[in-house]
Each structure stands twice: as C-alpha cells, then as structure tokens.
Amino acid sequence: MERVRDLASEKAAVIFTKSSCCMCHSIKTLFYELGASPAIHELDKDPQGPDMERALFRVFGSNPAVPAVFVGGRYVGSAKDVISFHVDGSLKQMLKASNAIWL
C-alpha cells in the first residue's frame, strides 16, 4: 500500500487503471476533457501492478479495484463515484481545489 500511497500523491490527479478496462478509459477521457492531466498508472503494465491492485481492493473495497481515482492525494472513488461527482459538479471543484485544473 505504501507504493500506492506514494504514487497517489505524486500529482494533483492520479488514476490507477488497466489498459483493457473500458471504464478506466472513460474516466481518463473525462479528466482530459475537464482540462486535467492526471498521472496514469496502468496496473497491468507494472510489475508491481497485481500487488497494488490487491492493496487498492483491501483498503478501499471497490470491486473491481480500478479505476481508482485520487485527487489532491485523497481517494475520490471508483468510476461510479467519479461520474456522480461529475454530474453534481463537485468533481470540477475538487480538481480546481487541488490545482489539477485552473479554469
């Protein structure tokens, strides 16, 4: 979990994904369309990916474990959570507050 914690705080917006996950792709696209440039960690391409995926599942309990989205170093949630925050307008506010976007 320490590696996940370190990576999650490396940038204002961080997304843990898998390259074959359609919801991960959707969340990445949403962030790009909002003007954010998140750090993307594709767990299926990282040698420590399976361990990080297990840690994400253990700590946050979402199944599947990806996408796992962090803003300002804090866990925001999975795709369902992020979409809900986007619909109610709070995702953009989170991104602004963490300096992931400026407008």
Swiss-Prot record:
One of its GO terms (cellular component) is cytoplasm. It comes from Arabidopsis thaliana (Mouse-ear cress). This is Putative glutaredoxin-C12. The lineage of its organism: Eukaryota, Viridiplantae, Streptophyta, Embryophyta, Tracheophyta. SUPFAM superfamilies: Thioredoxin-like. The gene is GRXC12. Keywords: Cytoplasm, Disulfide bond, Electron transport, Redox-active center, Transport. InterPro entries: GlrX-like_pln_2 (IPR011905), Glutaredoxin (IPR002109), Thioredoxin-like_sf (IPR036249). It is found in: Cytoplasm. Transmembrane segments: none annotated. Has a glutathione-disulfide oxidoreductase activity in the presence of NADPH and glutathione reductase. Reduces low molecular weight disulfides and proteins. GO terms for biological process: negative regulation of transcription by RNA polymerase II. Residues 1-102 form the Glutaredoxin domain. Its main location: cytoplasm. Disulfide bonds join C21-C24. Belongs to the glutaredoxin family. CC-type subfamily.
